[in-house]
Amino acid sequence: DGYPFIIVPLLLAVAAGYFINAYAVVPLLLLAAYFTYFFRNPSRTMPTDDHLLVSPADGTVVGVEEVEEDAYLNQKCRKIIIFLSIFDAHVNRAPLPGTIDFQQYTCGRFRPAYKEGVGYENERYSIGIHSAHTDILVTIIAGILARRIVSWVTLGDELQHGQLYGMI
């Protein structure tokens, strides 16, 4: 999904180098390099124990709180909030193996992700994963820069530990 963001600046750099000058190429090459970095997919070694949860995203844990979840789990649960900066990989992985038995896309705003309350205001996509050991709800929330949510899975899909299922 990131290829157009990388290829377009590279093509523009070639055109700028040909029609303008070499100095016009530099910002376009830097932009292509940044998009290559942004859309990267680092390899991860997943645990073999299906009881273990892995982080669904690279980033920084900025909050852990008890909440009453009423869309999928319908119970009190622990909510873990992970903030992705512009330097983090924006791919999302299944935190445990299981079957997707809930899916919900919600249109919304594109406020900065670090602002309080954006989890309920911004565009978001949630999947519920049913495993042999537990159920879990994972939500991807768009922000002011990462504004597009892409999902590669649908209801009924079986996910493996750490399998890619989407990106912001």
What are these regions (language model features)?
Residues 1-168:
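Contiguous, well-folded functional domains in the mature portion of proteins
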